[in-house]
Protein backbone atom coordinates (compact mmCIF):
# COMPACT_ATOMS: atom_id res chain seq x y z
CA UNK A 1 0.00 0.00 0.00
CA UNK A 2 1.44 3.33 -1.05
CA UNK A 3 -1.00 5.86 0.40
CA UNK A 4 -4.01 6.05 2.72
CA UNK A 5 -6.59 8.79 2.16
CA UNK A 6 -8.52 9.33 5.39
CA UNK A 7 -12.05 10.78 5.53
CA UNK A 8 -11.64 13.42 8.21
CA UNK A 9 -14.24 16.01 9.23
CA UNK A 10 -14.61 19.77 9.39
CA UNK A 11 -16.13 19.20 12.84
CA UNK A 12 -12.53 19.24 14.11
CA UNK A 13 -12.66 23.05 13.93
CA UNK A 14 -15.48 23.29 16.44
CA UNK A 15 -17.71 26.33 16.60
CA UNK A 16 -15.52 29.11 15.27
CA UNK A 17 -16.95 32.62 14.87
CA UNK A 18 -15.70 32.90 11.27
CA UNK A 19 -17.04 30.90 8.36
CA UNK A 20 -13.93 30.31 6.24
CA UNK A 21 -11.80 27.53 7.72
CA UNK A 22 -8.14 27.02 6.87
CA UNK A 23 -6.10 23.92 7.57
CA UNK A 24 -3.82 25.91 9.89
CA UNK A 25 -6.71 27.22 12.03
CA UNK A 26 -6.97 26.15 15.69
CA UNK A 27 -8.89 22.94 16.32
CA UNK A 28 -11.56 22.60 19.01
CA UNK A 29 -13.73 19.50 18.57
CA UNK A 30 -16.99 19.79 20.55
CA UNK A 31 -18.40 16.28 20.27
CA UNK A 32 -17.12 12.72 20.70
CA UNK A 33 -17.52 12.28 16.92
CA UNK A 34 -15.33 15.31 16.20
CA UNK A 35 -12.74 14.24 18.78
CA UNK A 36 -12.58 10.73 17.29
CA UNK A 37 -12.12 12.12 13.77
CA UNK A 38 -9.31 14.39 14.98
CA UNK A 39 -7.67 11.54 16.92
CA UNK A 40 -7.66 9.49 13.72
CA UNK A 41 -5.90 12.35 11.94
CA UNK A 42 -3.19 12.16 14.62
CA UNK A 43 -2.87 8.40 14.01
CA UNK A 44 -2.41 9.09 10.31
CA UNK A 45 0.36 11.58 11.05
CA UNK A 46 2.01 9.13 13.46
CA UNK A 47 2.04 6.36 10.84
CA UNK A 48 3.43 8.78 8.28
CA UNK A 49 6.24 9.98 10.58
CA UNK A 50 7.03 6.61 12.16
CA UNK A 51 6.66 4.15 9.29
CA UNK A 52 6.71 6.34 6.20
CA UNK A 53 3.18 5.30 5.26
CA UNK A 54 1.87 8.11 3.09
CA UNK A 55 -1.37 9.48 4.54
CA UNK A 56 -3.58 12.35 3.43
CA UNK A 57 -6.40 13.55 5.68
CA UNK A 58 -9.30 15.17 3.83
CA UNK A 59 -11.57 17.27 6.02
CA UNK A 60 -15.00 17.02 4.41
CA UNK A 61 -17.57 19.78 4.85
CA UNK A 62 -21.26 18.75 4.97
CA UNK A 63 -21.41 16.23 2.16
CA UNK A 64 -24.68 15.75 0.29
CA UNK A 65 -25.88 13.92 -2.79
CA UNK A 66 -27.32 10.69 -4.18
CA UNK A 67 -27.46 7.59 -1.97
CA UNK A 68 -27.19 9.68 1.19
CA UNK A 69 -29.11 8.26 4.12
CA UNK A 70 -32.12 10.60 4.28
CA UNK A 71 -32.82 9.57 7.87
CA UNK A 72 -29.52 10.66 9.41
CA UNK A 73 -30.29 13.46 11.90
CA UNK A 74 -26.82 15.00 11.56
CA UNK A 75 -25.65 14.60 7.99
CA UNK A 76 -28.82 14.65 5.91
CA UNK A 77 -30.28 18.10 6.40
CA UNK A 78 -30.88 18.67 2.67
CA UNK A 79 -32.86 15.47 1.92
CA UNK A 80 -34.60 15.75 5.29
CA UNK A 81 -35.72 19.33 4.61
CA UNK A 82 -36.84 18.44 1.06
CA UNK A 83 -38.91 15.49 2.29
CA UNK A 84 -40.56 17.62 4.97
CA UNK A 85 -41.26 20.55 2.64
CA UNK A 86 -42.80 18.35 -0.06
CA UNK A 87 -45.02 16.77 2.60
CA UNK A 88 -46.05 20.15 4.03
CA UNK A 89 -44.47 19.24 7.36
CA UNK A 90 -42.50 21.87 9.26
CA UNK A 91 -38.83 20.87 9.37
CA UNK A 92 -37.11 21.09 12.74
CA UNK A 93 -34.30 23.61 13.02
CA UNK A 94 -32.22 23.17 16.15
CA UNK A 95 -31.27 26.53 17.65
CA UNK A 96 -31.94 29.80 15.85
CA UNK A 97 -31.02 28.50 12.38
CA UNK A 98 -28.08 30.88 12.13
CA UNK A 99 -25.52 28.10 12.18
CA UNK A 100 -23.73 28.00 8.85
CA UNK A 101 -22.75 25.06 6.66
CA UNK A 102 -20.57 24.68 3.60
CA UNK A 103 -22.52 22.09 1.61
CA UNK A 104 -20.25 19.99 -0.59
CA UNK A 105 -21.65 17.79 -3.35
CA UNK A 106 -20.51 14.16 -3.28
CA UNK A 107 -18.95 14.33 -6.77
CA UNK A 108 -16.53 16.97 -5.45
CA UNK A 109 -15.63 14.70 -2.54
CA UNK A 110 -14.92 11.82 -4.94
CA UNK A 111 -12.80 14.10 -7.13
CA UNK A 112 -10.85 15.31 -4.08
CA UNK A 113 -10.18 11.73 -3.01
CA UNK A 114 -8.90 10.79 -6.46
CA UNK A 115 -6.59 13.80 -6.51
CA UNK A 116 -5.32 13.11 -2.98
CA UNK A 117 -4.48 9.52 -3.92
CA UNK A 118 -1.85 10.65 -6.42
CA UNK A 119 -0.96 14.29 -5.76
CA UNK A 120 2.73 14.86 -5.19
CA UNK A 121 3.39 16.75 -1.99
CA UNK A 122 0.09 15.70 -0.40
CA UNK A 123 1.56 12.99 1.84
CA UNK A 124 1.33 13.92 5.51
CA UNK A 125 -1.05 16.79 4.80
CA UNK A 126 -4.52 17.75 6.01
CA UNK A 127 -6.65 19.25 3.22
CA UNK A 128 -10.09 20.85 3.46
CA UNK A 129 -12.60 19.64 0.87
CA UNK A 130 -15.36 22.24 0.63
CA UNK A 131 -17.17 24.33 -1.95
CA UNK A 132 -17.79 27.69 -0.30
CA UNK A 133 -19.63 29.83 0.44
CA UNK A 134 -21.40 28.87 3.63
CA UNK A 135 -25.17 29.14 4.09
CA UNK A 136 -27.17 29.28 7.29
CA UNK A 137 -29.82 26.64 7.84
CA UNK A 138 -32.49 29.33 7.47
CA UNK A 139 -30.97 30.41 4.13
CA UNK A 140 -30.96 26.76 3.00
CA UNK A 141 -34.59 26.39 4.01
CA UNK A 142 -35.57 29.57 2.14
CA UNK A 143 -33.74 28.41 -1.00
CA UNK A 144 -35.39 24.98 -0.87
CA UNK A 145 -38.83 26.55 -0.33
CA UNK A 146 -38.21 28.72 -3.39
CA UNK A 147 -37.00 25.83 -5.58
CA UNK A 148 -39.85 23.56 -4.54
CA UNK A 149 -42.56 26.22 -4.69
CA UNK A 150 -43.44 25.68 -1.05
CA UNK A 151 -43.71 28.05 1.89
CA UNK A 152 -43.25 25.88 4.97
CA UNK A 153 -41.77 27.59 8.01
CA UNK A 154 -39.41 25.79 10.39
CA UNK A 155 -40.21 24.52 13.83
CA UNK A 156 -37.44 25.69 16.17
CA UNK A 157 -36.13 23.34 18.86
CA UNK A 158 -33.37 23.84 21.44
CA UNK A 159 -29.84 23.71 20.06
CA UNK A 160 -28.15 20.31 20.21
CA UNK A 161 -25.10 19.93 22.43
CA UNK A 162 -21.93 19.71 20.34
CA UNK A 163 -23.63 20.94 17.17
CA UNK A 164 -21.62 23.52 15.25
Give the residues covered by each predicted segment.
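Short, glycine/charged-enriched secondary-structure capping and boundary segments
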Residues: 18-22, 71-75, 106-108, 142-144
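C-terminal substrate-binding subdomain of Rossmann-fold SDR/epimerase-dehydratase oxidoreductases
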Residues: 86-164
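Active-site proximal helix/loop that lines the substrate pocket
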Residues: 9-15, 62-68, 98, 118, ...
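N-terminal Rossmann-like NAD(P)+-binding domain of SDR-like oxidoreductases, especially those catalyzing
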Residues: 1-63, 146
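Solvent-exposed, non-membrane alpha-helical residues enriched in polar/charged side chains
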Residues: 45, 79-83, 114
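Short-chain dehydrogenase/reductase
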Residues: 25, 30-41, 72-79, 102-103, ...
Amino acid sequence: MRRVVYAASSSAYGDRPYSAKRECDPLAPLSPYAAAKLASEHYCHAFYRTYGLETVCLRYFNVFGPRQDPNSPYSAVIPLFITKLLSGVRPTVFGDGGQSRDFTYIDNIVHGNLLAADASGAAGQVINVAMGPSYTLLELLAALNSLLGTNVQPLHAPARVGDV
